[in-house]
Swiss-Prot record:
Top-rank taxon, per record: Eukaryota
Alphabetized UniProt keyword annotations: Mitochondrion, Repeat, Ribonucleoprotein, Ribosomal protein
UniProt biased composition (Polar residues): 39-55
Subunit structure: Component of the mitochondrial ribosome large subunit.
Protein's recorded name: Large ribosomal subunit protein mL102 (rPPR5)
Basic and acidic residues composition bias: residue spans: 70-82
Taxonomy of the source species: Eukaryota, Viridiplantae, Streptophyta, Embryophyta, Tracheophyta
Major localization class: mitochondrion
Region (Disordered): 39-82
Amino acid sequence: MAFISRSKRYQSKARVYLSLPRSSNSSLFSLPRLFSTIEETQTPANANPETQSPDAKSETKKNLTSTETRPLRERFQRGKRQNHEKLEDTICRMMDNRAWTTRLQNSIRDLVPEWDHSLVYNVLHGAKKLEHALQFFRWTERSGLIRHDRDTHMKMIKMLGEVSKLNHARCILLDMPEKGVPWDEDMFVVLIESYGKAGIVQESVKIFQKMKDLGVERTIKSYNSLFKVILRRGRYMMAKRYFNKMVSEGVEPTRHTYNLMLWGFFLSLRLETALRFFEDMKTRGISPDDATFNTMINGFCRFKKMDEAEKLFVEMKGNKIGPSVVSYTTMIKGYLAVDRVDDGLRIFEEMRSSGIEPNATTYSTLLPGLCDAGKMVEAKNILKNMMAKHIAPKDNSIFLKLLVSQSKAGDMAAATEVLKAMATLNVPAEAGHYGVLIENQCKASAYNRAIKLLDTLIEKEIILRHQDTLEMEPSAYNPIIEYLCNNGQTAKAEVLFRQLMKRGVQDQDALNNLIRGHAKEGNPDSSYEILKIMSRRGVPRESNAYELLIKSYMSKGEPGDAKTALDSMVEDGHVPDSSLFRSVIESLFEDGRVQTASRVMMIMIDKNVGIEDNMDLIAKILEALLMRGHVEEALGRIDLLNQNGHTADLDSLLSVLSEKGKTIAALKLLDFGLERDLSLEFSSYDKVLDALLGAGKTLNAYSVLCKIMEKGSSTDWKSSDELIKSLNQEGNTKQADVLSRMIKKGQGIKKQNNVSL
C-alpha cells in the first residue's frame, strides 16, 4: 500500500459560540470559515443540490449575490497584518521555538478548536525534529485529545524507522490493538525494512516471524521486504530457505521477487545459484523484464563472463525489450574491466546510434578505461561531447586522470583543455589539478606556461580552499619554485609556498630554494626570515643555503649578520669551509669588530678547519686582541690552538708588544709561554725585560727574570746589572741581593759547562 507524504486537508467543526452581529448572510460568519486552515464553502450534510427546492436555490443564490455586492469591512490594529498561517504550521513553529512544557501544551490546546486525525497527521509531518513529533504524538493521546488512527500510527512508525529509533517504533506498533487500531501488513513491512537498514537482520527476521503469531497475513510484499534485507547482508542461504517456505505456503513469487533474488545471489558471488533461479523464473512463465536482464548482465560482468553477458544483451533486444542507458553502461563497464576497450567503444557507438543518450554514469565509466588504455584521442572527443551536452561526471577524480593521462601522452594542449572543460561543467578546479599541469609544463621546459597557471592558482587562492581534497604534490611545486628562485622571481615563489604552508606543507627542498633565491637576489633578510621559519618548524636547513645567505650578507656589507647566519649554520651541524670562515673573519676584522672576529676564529679553530691556511689571519687577530688589552681572550685562543696541534708565533707577538710599549700584555704573554714550556727565543726575553725596565717596572722585570732562571734558561741579558741597581735605588734590596746571587750562580754553572766541554 502506498502512502502519501504530503499534508492532508484539515477540516474542523466548531464547538464554541461567538457573539457576532446579525447578518442576513449567515454563511459569512460560519465557524468553520473562521477557524479552518483551508477556506471553503460547506453545505449541510443533508443538503443535496439536486433535491433542493427551487425556492431554496433562489434564496441561496440571493444570499450569495448580496454577499458579493456588499463589501466586507474588517478593521485590524495598525501595524498588524492578518495571519494566514495554517494551524498545523503554527503548532510546529511553537514546538520548534519553545521547550516542551505544560505551558506550551496548554497554548496548543487553546489554539485548536477541535482535534481531528488530519491535523495530528499534518503536525507529525511538519515537525522539524523527531522528538517534537514523538512528544506531540504521545501527549495528544494521553491528554484525551484524540485517539490515533491507522494513518497517524503509520506516520509515527515510519518517522522513527527512518532515524533508527526502532524500539520506540516497535512499541508503538505492538500497542496498537490495545487502542483498538488493527494491524496491517504494511506496518510490519516498514519495521522489517527499518531494522534491515540499521543492519539488524535478526530483528527483521523476528518481526517477519511474529507476523504469523499475531495473525497478520504475510503476502509477497512482506516476503520481498525480507529478501531484500537478508540478501543485502549476504545471507543467501537464508533467502533460499524462506523462498522455499514461501512457495510451500502458496505465495507465488513475482517478477520483482526473482529480481531481488538474482540481485542478492550475484551480490554474494553465487553465479550457479543465480542461473538456477533465472531458469526457474522462466519455467514458472514469468518473463524477464529490463531490470531482470540488467541484473543478469551486471552479474556476468562481475564474473568477467562477457560472452554470456553479450548473449543476454542480444536476447534482451530480441525480446523487444529495448536496452536502456543502464544496460549499455553495464556492458561498457564489463568490457573495460576485461581490457576489451574496443568492444566498450563499440557498445558506446551502438548506444548513440540507437538514440539513447549517455548519462553521467556512462561517461564516468568510459573515460577512465580509455585513459588506462592510452586512447587519449577518443577520450578527448568524449570530453568534448560532455561539454557540448553539459553533462558532468559523477566522480570528479576523472578529470585528474584525464590531466595525468594527457600529460603523460605529451599532449599538453589537450591537458589544458581539461581545465576549460571543468569550468564549462561548473566543476571547481582544485590545487591538485593545477599541480599536474604545472609539473608537466616544467618537465617540458615550458616555464612561461607554468607561470601563467601558477599566477591563476595564486590570485584565486585555490590552495587555501579548505573544502578541496586534492592538494598540490611536491613534485609539482618544487620544480616551479626552483625555477623561480633561479630566475629572479623568488618573491612569487614565496607567495606560493606561504599559501602551501597554511595547508601544513613544510617542504625542505622548497624552503632551502627560497633561501638561496633571496640570497642570490641580494635580499638576505628575506632569506633569514625563511631560515627562522624553518628553525621554528624543525625543517632541516642545507649547507649550501647557509653559504649563499652568508655571502649575500657580506656582499651587502653586513658582516655582523653574516656572523649570525654562520652561528646558525654551525648550530645546525654544518661545518663551513676554510674560505667561508676566512671571508667572514676578514670582513669583521676590517669592520673593526676584533672580538667578534675572534669568536668566529675560535669556531674555526675548534672545528679544526683551515687553520694552517689562515695562520696569518690568526696572527693579526691575536695581535689586535693583545694590543687592545683583551689579553685573556687572546691567551685563550692561543691555548685552543695548542690543543688542536697548532702553535702561534709568540716571539713575533712579544716583539711587537715590546716595541709598542704594551708591557703588561707582553708580560702576561711571556708568563703564559713560560708556564706551558713553550719554545721562545732568548731575544724575546731580552726585549720584554728591556721594555719592562724601560717602563720602570723593575719588580715585574725581576719576577720575569727569576722565572726564566728558575726554568734553567740562562740569559746574557746585558741590562741585569742595571736592573739590580734600579732595585737597590727603589729600596728593593732583598730582591736585588737574590737576583745577584742567582746571576752569579748561573754564571758559575755556565763556566763549569764550558770547562767540561
